[in-house]
Amino acid sequence: MDAPATASRQPIAEEPRMSQESSLSTVSTTSLVFDRLHEHNEKSYHSSSQRRRAPSASRGGYADHPDDDDDDDESYKEADTNDLETGPFLAPASVMMRRVGVDRGLKKVILILAAAFLFAWGAALFVFLSNKSYKHASTIDHDPSATSRGSGKPVTLDQVISGFWYPTSHSISWIEGPNGEDGLLLEQGARGKDYLVVEDVRSGNKDSQVSANVVQSRTLMKNPWINVGGRQLAPSDTRPSKDMKKVLVSTDRQRNWRYSYTALYWIFDVETQTAEALDPEHPDGRVQLATWSPQSNAIVFTRDNNLFLRKLDGDKKVTQITNDGGPEYFYGIPDWVYEEEVFATNSATWYSEDGKYVAFLRTNETGVPEYPLQYFLSRPSGKEKPPGEETYPDEKRIKYPRAGSHNPVVDLLFFDVERGDVFSVDIDGGFADDDRLINMVLWANDKVLIKETNRVSDIMRVVLVDVVARTGKTVNTIDVGELDGGWFEISHTTQFIPADPANGRPQDGYIDTVVHGNGDHIAYFSPMDNAEPVYLTGGDWEVDDGPSAVDLKNNLVYFVATKESSIQRHVYSVHLNRSDLKPFTDTKFESYYDISFSSGAGYALLSYQGPKIPWQKVVSTPSSPVSYEHVVEKNEDLAENAKKYELPILNYGTLKVDGVELNYVERRPPHFDEKKKYPVLFQQYSGPGSQSVHKKFAVDFQSYVASALGYLVVTVDGRGTGFIGRKNRVLIRDHLGYWEAHDQIAAAQAWAAKKYVDPARIAIWGWSYGGFNTLKTLEMDAGRTFSYGMAVAPVTDWRFYDSIYTERYMRTPQLNPSGYDQTAVSNVSALAGNVRWLMMHGVGDDNVHYQNTLTLLDKLDLNGIENYDVHVFPDSDHGIYFHGANRIVYDKLSNWLINAFNGEWLKVAGAKPIVEPKARV
């Protein structure tokens, strides 16, 4: 069978581990010894004729200190570059050696012994090779759990940036059949097939038991284009109706924000293979969102922020549902902050299963302040400047609610398709308009379950609305701030469980992720208004994705959790009555899995993401009556590359800080030697609930630094991050940046005490929240542990960031003024205590505004602080890509770090002019 759906090369965030398939063979050991003999001889030769000053732990004790006038022997430097770990990127300390004369007789004895040794070694090598025991390192499978590496090439920065090391992955567009058939997928653009085809995932399998139940494939679109009015248009996206008689096709898509876009929409008829405009009277009207009715008889869509309905009953008339949509009123779609922080999608429209009602969000941005984004080279507004004004920058103004400012006012409205009217349902005891966040909307037959919180996200109301009776009530109120001082995270995995008395489900219910004990677990609420659930999971571990799927026939709930280890992920199932919790994946091996289930949960795309080379399979689940397995991706090319290149040695462990066990991964250079003194780069993100230490396979920038530059790279997930217990997560509330920085400093102090670490050369870096915590760490440490730092797109004051994210962790500036003062990067005198640091930012960043960097620069100017470098990128957003900027970011990080660890930045402070260059001898 062809690989289902679309293959893509996806970056995966971390380095892996592999099972210990094979230890070092005799030959690889011999190779290592041979390499070290050569290395020893070469170094001994140069050290006998060259004096080098060993650095002390003090600031002035760098090997490349500007006062080291005797470090000018070019022959030494040239030879030294052959060792990646002591070459141009790493200036090692050497001990002083004296030349000792040797008499001729002793020389003769030494030569005879050397000749005998070489003869014996050659004979042993001949026997060794003749026994065919030799295996070159490039033929040995990559083992991420290995404690040493063989020979190979270093990882390059070009490879990391180009995607050379990205595992190939596939996604499946699972689709439910018109009659509820399970295991169907949507194939688009598959080689040798029609353009859009519905396939049974088991098609092509020769097993008679499997093939007997395969649903016949069905072509929806033959060609990779549609003809409209004599024009051939290429689809940007395709969405079949549930009955598979029509396809909603979008063309000419234009991006707006992270998830949102506008496009032209067309209705494609499968039988006639013809297309017509979604709105025949406005065929070129750009649509923001279009959604099928579950009954396949209508499409609801948003255009110009108003909601419309197109019925497919032969009448091509379009009904306008709302009329006052515009720049400040949105219907059926989220505004910027709800798209970014709440729904993580471009949709705020929800159809009832019977197609009789449409729930949609109304967003009023009238009171939300605007933030101007300036573009100096591009014109994202699409507006041409009038003659004579072409040199002025383009400007895009977005309604961006910052912490403490006015939030958009949101309401949930309903459209009765049969009556044609819009209505709302008032609920007693609700949050005030400026204090209400609507986080989730879920249809449950003719009822709607709504989760809303106050704006600081520590009180939740669960509301149940009866759309037929047009009434509603609050069924549960939870004050988690009172419970543990924490907050509610937004979840989109809540699933409706319809009643089935014959199958042990007497009433409707739902499954949700809830706070239970010291973490996130899944619970079953039934009936719908029950506030006391059955907890399906519990214990000293957490559910990461749940419910991932529900098999209603067998009452099985699938989920992904950290039950084996906080840095692993396995898939499990549990019965709705809480019995029979068992793993679906093999838990005997360290693994990190992701999974995508078919509509009926009978099949799944199982993605193994590490620590070995990633692979993917389509498999049957315990819910399927027939066993099935098909390998989709082996990543054989990646496996071959991993054999040929020297990937870092991965050392996983835990570090105890203030009694809390923190996960870490230490990436060591391929030929790590505990007798050497290594610089250390700490890389972290540190954001609330995030995780950077895990068992995924990844070869990334950190891998390049360890492999090619020869530095140690350490990642420690400090308090505030995810999956180390809720108590350790919510500790950071009201003072972001304090415990995160504290734990990075504690980790750096632990590494500085190690014998193989040069304590004078320790740096830290991060992007976004990681950039913020880099600066907070440098500020708190004031140069006592960290010498250098690199911050990309950092927040420097949380009063500048969006309200929904910030207030969840900090509450409002009005409620927590001292917290905001303390969390801002403001102690610039402490920053002056570091040797040097780097800051980079995109001028067109719509997420973390460039104002963050400019404000910090002004504080530095006011205090005369100059020990930093800045690089800004015009027109780049938070990802920094405009005009090849992303490559420049990583080039800058790499080169800046090399200069830092080579001691070059020590020469910048107090620089003195050289009137006449020093003559070379």
From Swiss-Prot:
Domain of life (superkingdom): Eukaryota
Region (Disordered): 1-87
Biased composition regions of type Acidic residues, renumbered to the chain: 66-75
Disulphide-bridged cysteine pairs: none
InterPro entries, alphabetized: AB_hydrolase_fold (IPR029058), Peptidase_S9_cat (IPR001375), Peptidase_S9B_N (IPR002469), Serine_Prot_S9B/DPPIV (IPR050278)
Membrane-spanning segments: 109-129
Compositionally biased intervals (Basic and acidic residues): 35-45
Cytoplasmic topological segments: 1-108
Residues bearing carbohydrate: 131, 364, 577, 827
Enzyme class: hydrolase
Recorded GO CC terms: fungal-type vacuole membrane; plasma membrane
Membrane topology: Single-pass type II membrane protein
Listed Gene3D superfamilies: alpha/beta hydrolase, Dipeptidylpeptidase IV, N-terminal domain
Reaction equations catalysed: Release of an N-terminal dipeptide, Xaa-Yaa-|-Zaa-, from a polypeptide, preferentially when Yaa is Pro, provided Zaa is neither Pro nor hydroxyproline
EC number assigned by the record: 3.4.14.5
Annotated active site: 768 (charge relay system), 845 (charge relay system), 878 (charge relay system)
Compositional bias per record (Low complexity), positions renumbered to this chain: 22-33
Topological region Vacuolar: 130-921
Keywords: Aminopeptidase, Glycoprotein, Hydrolase, Membrane, Protease, Serine protease, Signal-anchor, Transmembrane, Transmembrane helix, Vacuole
Compartments, as annotated in UniProt: Vacuole membrane
Described purpose of this protein according to its UniProt entry: Type IV dipeptidyl-peptidase which removes N-terminal dipeptides sequentially from polypeptides having unsubstituted N-termini provided that the penultimate residue is proline.
Family statement drawn from the similarity comment of this UniProt entry: Belongs to the peptidase S9B family.
Name the UniProt record assigns to this protein: Probable dipeptidyl-aminopeptidase B
Organism this protein belongs to: Colletotrichum graminicola (strain M1.001 / M2 / FGSC 10212)
